[in-house]
């Protein structure tokens, strides 16, 4: 809910099971409450069921989908194609289906194939450049494309990472990734020479595209995704606010070109600052092409913002060369290295007392030395600022008010309660927001109600005009509407704009044709206001339920974009990359023409595999090598050789080692690196 309050147009959330974040589940009841809250602003709720599903879980998963539909979810993110083949048959045409990033979408051909299976939106691989995203958009201009813009990065293409399952029996495709890529490795050559010692060579920095949002918009991305796995509420507040404000700035800069997907402007009581939020250092990854500085080899942990360098150290304190303001309780850290070791470690401490730039830790850290860079990974003052109410989201409306001593000359059906000439009042309201399209409503609804304790009758009508309009009518006793003895304008405006306990705020009241000359009791104006709000709520809810003209299953089967055409060549050599974990998925791919529907890696190795285990699934075996590769475990666009400056193809220095290279864990398990220079890709494989 904090994400919606701080400007998100949509939120994605894991259900109790079957999400790609196993430890971040939410009950159906809680998701229903979130839907109710989000829909007030025209925002949407997307539920992740983006793991591969086993046969004995299949019916339970479908039952969960039905429950979630009943509580109002707007979209499902799916990975398992067997599940997709069933879900598309049971969800109503108001619920969207999104292809999770776990579907490994790198090309327009794959995106088109997914669209033909019934997906309405595709979440693209994080590794894509702006040019590659634009190529997909140009080929498929009607398909919604969603791009990651912020948060933790997986070093492997999502959906084709098996190293956690292989090493620890914990599958990334089942939402239980063991964070293999955050471990420290020795990098060794084929002769056993150590090139790097205990460095986090697969640990990437965090993504931040805050300065590239317009580029992404113009490339064809229609939705931006912020990763927030197990992050606290302060992270959500800060990051969502930063991106929402930047999007609004872009829309204001280019009126008419872009629009927001939900309603309401946010007033913030703090200034967002991404440097003060959990991060491992930031990178724009491959958005603008390959860069060397995308990984964080010294530590997989959050460094935070750079705040200066250690200047002078005393027994219980030290001085910092910095322009930052420090507070008691700040969390600081630094990178240290022993004189006799190549490895770097992160040391942290908390400030007990800050006197200007002189800091007194609770306990002086042993590795601190003059000249060292200092980082703040917990800003006490900023956290305190975020702990209270930090945002208010309101939908701006304009209200028109009119009154007449006459009833409507041509009453519509349902207006039989207004048959005399005692007079009418009316009001209509419109959402005012230049960042969105007007709300449209093409149906008409009439309703009469009468309060037996009052002499006034109310009538409300939703017109089929753009935007939302509401026309209640009022009848009075004793000769119709009475002229007021004193001006009524201020009271009319005051009563109609009392919207404090709603999601609305009135920016303007327009009183039509001198209607303020009549005396209207405040209680009647309050009831009129309530009716306006009630109808606006209905209009916004109806705005959510747009029918999706999804291709029928029969129609889908007519398209023969062969499965072999839409995935990298490794899929043909290694059919387990299709992640076939249930009978429905096997049947689906057989119908797609897949010649060998091999079981998923997790089915073949349910508890993982020990290094050196024999396998009938030999792949990428290289004759003459000392060690034969048996399994492709990760496909990475990140290249260690390039990042260390040894890519000759891109102008790096010539290596002094002999390939192949290996990553080695402290327990001596080894993983072979294969450099696919033609496709500019690094593969991580096990050895046997």
Locations of regions flagged by a protein language model:
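Short, glycine/polar-rich helix-capping loops at beta-to-alpha or helix-loop-helix junctions
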Residues: 106-110
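Alpha-helix capping/helix-boundary segments
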Residues: 82-83
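Conserved phosphotransfer cores of two-component systems
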Residues: 91-92
């Amino acid at each position: 809910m904090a994400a919606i309050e701080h400007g998100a147009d949509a939120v994605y959330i894991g259900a109790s099971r079957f999400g790609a974040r196993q430890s971040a589940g939410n009950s159906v009841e809680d998701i229903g409450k979130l839907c109710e809250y989000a829909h007030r602003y025209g925002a949407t709720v997307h539920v992740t069921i983006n793991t591969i599903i086993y046969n004995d879980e299949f019916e339970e998963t479908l039952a969960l989908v039905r429950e979630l539909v009943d509580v109002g979810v707007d979209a499902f993110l799916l990975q398992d194609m067997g599940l997709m083949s069933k879900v598309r048959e049971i969800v109503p045409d108001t619920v969207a289906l999104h292809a999770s990033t776990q579907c490994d979408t790198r090309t327009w051909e794959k995106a088109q194939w997914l669209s033909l299976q019934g997906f309405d939106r595709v979440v693209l691989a994080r590794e894509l450049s702006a040019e590659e995203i634009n190529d997909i958009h140009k080929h498929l201009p009607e398909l919604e494309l969603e791009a990651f813009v912020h948060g933790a990065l997986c070093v492997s293409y999502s959906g084709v990472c098996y190293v956690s399952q292989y090493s620890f029996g914990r599958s990334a495709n089942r939402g239980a990734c063991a964070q293999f890529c955050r471990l420290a490795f020795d990098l060794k050559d084929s002769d056993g020479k150590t090139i790097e010692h205990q460095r986090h060579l697969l640990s990437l920095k965090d993504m931040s595209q805050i300065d590239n949002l317009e580029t992404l918009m113009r490339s064809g991305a229609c939705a931006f995704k912020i990763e927030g796995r197990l992050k606290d509420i302060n992270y959500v507040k800060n990051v969502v606010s930063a991106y929402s404000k930047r999007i609004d700035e872009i829309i204001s800069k280019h009126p008419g070109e872009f629009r927001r997907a939900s309603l309401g402007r946010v007033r913030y009581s703090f200034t967002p600052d991404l440097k003060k939020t959990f991060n491992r250092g930031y990178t724009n990854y491959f958005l603008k092409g390959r860069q060397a500085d995308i990984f964080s080899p010294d530590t997989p942990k959050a460094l935070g913002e750079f705040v200066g360098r250690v200047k002078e150290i005393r027994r219980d304190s030290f001085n910092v060369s910095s322009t930052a303001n420090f507070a008691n309780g700040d969390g600081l850290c630094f990178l240290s290295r022993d004189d006799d070791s190549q490895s770097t470690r992160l040391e942290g401490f908390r400030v007990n007392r800050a006197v200007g730039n002189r800091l007194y830790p609770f306990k002086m850290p042993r590795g601190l030395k003059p000249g060292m860079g200092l980082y703040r990974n917990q800003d006490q003052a900023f956290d305190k600022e975020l702990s209270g109410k930090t945002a208010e989201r309101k939908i701006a409306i304009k209200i028109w008010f009119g009154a007449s001593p006459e009833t409507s000359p041509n009453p519509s059906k349902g207006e039989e309660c207004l048959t005399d000439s005692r007079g009418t009042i009316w009001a209509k309201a419109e959402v005012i927001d230049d960042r969105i399209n007007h709300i449209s409503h093409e149906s008409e609804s009439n309703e009469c109600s009468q309060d037996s304790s009052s002499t006034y009758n109310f009538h409300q009508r939703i017109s089929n005009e753009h935007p939302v309009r509401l026309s209640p009518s009022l009848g009075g006793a004793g000769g119709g509407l009475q002229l007021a003895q004193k001006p009524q304008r201020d009271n009319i405006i005051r009563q109609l704009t009392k919207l404090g306990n709603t999601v609305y705020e009135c920016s303007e009241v327009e009183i039509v044709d001198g209607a303020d000359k009549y005396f209207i009791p405040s209680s009647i104006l309050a009831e009129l206001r309530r009716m306006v709000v009630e109808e606006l709520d209905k209009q916004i809810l109806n705005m959510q339920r747009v029918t999706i003209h999804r291709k029928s299953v029969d129609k889908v089967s007519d398209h023969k974009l062969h499965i072999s055409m839409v995935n990298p060549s490794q899929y043909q050599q290694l059919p387990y990359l299709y992640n076939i974990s249930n009978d429905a998925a096997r049947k689906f791919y057989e119908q797609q023409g897949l010649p060998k529907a091999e079981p998923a890696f997790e089915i073949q190795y349910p508890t993982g595999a020990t290094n050196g285990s024999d396998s009938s699934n030999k792949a990428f075996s290289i004759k003459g090598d000392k060690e034969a590769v048996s399994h492709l475990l990760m496909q990475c666009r990140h290249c260690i050789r390039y990042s260390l400056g040894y890519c000759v193809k891109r102008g790096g220095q010539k290596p002094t080692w002999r390939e192949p290279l290996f990553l080695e864990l402290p327990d001596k398990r080894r993983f072979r690196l294969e450099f696919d220079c033609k496709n500019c890709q690094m593969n991580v494989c096990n050895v046997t």
